[in-house]
């Protein structure tokens, strides 16, 4: 057993250096035996001890002694010539919506008297992270059932922003984004139904990617109808993002809609020339989406970076339309039908249990009511509603397919507001416009979700209050590598992540 008696919250200088390394640098150092897995684990646990109490990003952390013993076992494997993969010896905390064998999956809800038993097996993408050599140290905090883009729940409490601890971290991958930004994890997994791999990275000045649907197979109870929630990576560098995506990605016959395309070696294919490309900037969709003052102005400063990369920016303020898709007018109703149908159905068992229903936050009740009794004055969702929504979504795809015949990329802000007061459940208004639901303020992310195309968050800087913002860039379906290459070129031009560290890091 490793001696932990000398462990202390304050990290030494070598530990400070270890947590600052990019994940690929860390991987190389471990492989070359320049640093031991025990040293790495100790450095990250020190960082967590020092910073996590201030942000509440990592939850259900395993005991230090147990984790150091697991790290020692990884060192012994290396000594015997066995290296499991590029994440060998990495501390890794999994988003608390995904199963990890031996850990409860609380989803921000299951607590006494509704305890979640330890999972019996890993989720499919988590299997792959384990096979790559990672050590699971705990979970990253989420919003209840992943609903809403503010990470707060009644099990572990609220996760706050890496750059301002009075502000929201975003959600539902808020814990993951904050942990990566504050160097408490080398990289993190997340998931995205409605912006959760875009908004939290945007608000914490890191990279996040929602891959093409099917790129990362999900081992859900339903593997056919659920085509909106996807898993993906969060990282501080494009190379790290690519490496984690290629670890998580790839076909699996347990997930029949997963993409039969080898993710190959994304991390070694990141250099690309974007000269001659063009991007359609949708902005606020021609004034349709309310935006907090300063959001558009900050995002539009990124036009200069696109230009430096040889990418022409074209203002294209309206959504394209098609036979059954009326653009802006259809966007929110279309999203709501799918959201109520899928989330309300997933929560139906809780809906039927009066005691559990009484413990739910308003976000979940809204989705359940939207399906079964109606919400916002709308009637309950019917099978015909879902069919008609699928027709509209098909038409939307055809409209964007034509748009992508004219443009290489499409871009929008990653959020309509800057990170808000962490004590609020959600923004009630944006620039004087009342929000009709807990998630209407996130509507800017609906396009990427409904299309199922790959989307990446790229940092674009900070407002006068020091709050980060990002833009989401959408590529044609299955062109995930293009976005990773763009992220690499972007970081080389801007250096936002590397040059603008959270003040908590010192």
Segments from the language model and where they lie:
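Amidase signature
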Residues: 1-82, 247-443, 450, 478, ...
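Gly/Ser-rich catalytic/binding loops embedded in alpha/beta enzyme cores
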Residues: 2-194, 304, 309, 398, ...
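Short, well-ordered beta-strand elements within core beta-sheets of diverse protein domains
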Residues: 25-32, 112-117, 229-236, 376-381, ...
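Short Gly/Pro-enriched turn/cap motifs at secondary-structure boundaries
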Residues: 82, 116-118, 166-170, 198, ...
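Short glycine-/acidic-enriched loop or helix-start segments at secondary-structure transitions
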Residues: 103-104, 146-148, 199, 290-291, ...
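Short glycine/serine-rich loop segments
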Residues: 121-252, 449-462, 467-470
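Short, hinge-like loop/turn segments at secondary-structure boundaries
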Residues: 154-157, 204-208, 337-340, 429-430, ...
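Short, electropositive alpha-helical surface patch
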Residues: 468-481
């Amino acid at each position: 057993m490793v001696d932990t008696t000398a462990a202390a919250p304050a990290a030494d200088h070598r530990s400070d250096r270890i947590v600052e390394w990019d994940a690929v640098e860390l991987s190389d150092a471990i492989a070359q035996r320049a640093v031991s897995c025990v040293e790495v684990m100790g450095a990250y646990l020190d960082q967590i001890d020092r910073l996590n109490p201030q942000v509440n990003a990592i939850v259900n952390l395993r005991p230090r002694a147990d984790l150091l013993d697991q790290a020692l076992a990884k060192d012994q494997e290396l000594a015997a010539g066995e290296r499991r993969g590029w994440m060998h010896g990495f501390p890794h905390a999994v988003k608390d919506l995904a199963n990890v064998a031996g850990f409860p999956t609380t989803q921000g809800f299951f607590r006494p008297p509704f305890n979640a038993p330890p999972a019996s097996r890993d989720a499919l993408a988590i299997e792959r992270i384990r096979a790559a050599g990672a050590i699971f140290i705990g979970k990253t905090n989420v919003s209840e059932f992943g609903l809403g883009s503010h990470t707060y729940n009644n099990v572990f409490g609220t996760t706050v922003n890496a750059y301002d601890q009075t502000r929201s971290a975003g959600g539902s991958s808020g814990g993951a984004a904050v942990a990566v930004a504050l160097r408490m994890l080398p990289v993190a997994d997340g998931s995205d139904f409605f912006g959760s791999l875009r908004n939290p990275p945007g608000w914490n000045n890191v990279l996040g990617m929602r891959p093409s649907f099917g790129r990362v197979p999900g081992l859900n109870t339903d593997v056919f109808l659920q085509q909106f929630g996807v898993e993906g990576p969060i990282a501080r560098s494009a190379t790290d993002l690519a490496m984690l995506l290629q670890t998580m990605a790839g076909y699996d016959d347990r997930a029949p809609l997963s993409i039969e395309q080898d993710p190959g070696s994304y991390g070694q294919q990141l250099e690309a020339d974007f000269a001659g490309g063009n991007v359609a900037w949708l902005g606020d969709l021609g004034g349709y989406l309310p935006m907090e003052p300063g959001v558009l102005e900050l995002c539009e400063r990124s036009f200069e970076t696109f230009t430096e990369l040889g990418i022409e920016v074209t203002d294209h303020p309206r959504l394209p339309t098609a036979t059954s898709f009326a653009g802006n007018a259809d966007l929110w109703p279309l999203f709501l039908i799918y959201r109520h149908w899928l989330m309300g159905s997933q929560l139906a068992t809780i809906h039927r249990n009066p005691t559990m229903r009484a413990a739910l936050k308003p976000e979940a009740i809204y989705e359940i009511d939207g399906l079964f009794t109606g919400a916002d004055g709308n009637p309950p969702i019917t099978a015909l509603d879902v069919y008609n929504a699928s027709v509209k979504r098909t038409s939307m795809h055809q409209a964007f397919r034509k748009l992508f015949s004219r443009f290489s990329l499409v871009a929008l802000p990653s959020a309509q507001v800057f990170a808000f007061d962490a004590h609020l459940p959600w923004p009630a208004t944006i620039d004087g416009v009342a929000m009709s639901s807990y998630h209407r303020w996130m509507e800017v992310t609906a396009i990427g979700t409904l299309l199922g195309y790959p989307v990446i968050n790229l940092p674009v800087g900070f407002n006068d209050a020091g709050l980060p913002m990002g833009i989401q860039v959408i590529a044609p379906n299955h062109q995930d590598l293009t976005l990773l290459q763009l992220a690499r070129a972007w970081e080389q031009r801007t250096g936002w992540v590397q040059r603008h560290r959270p003040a908590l890091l010192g």
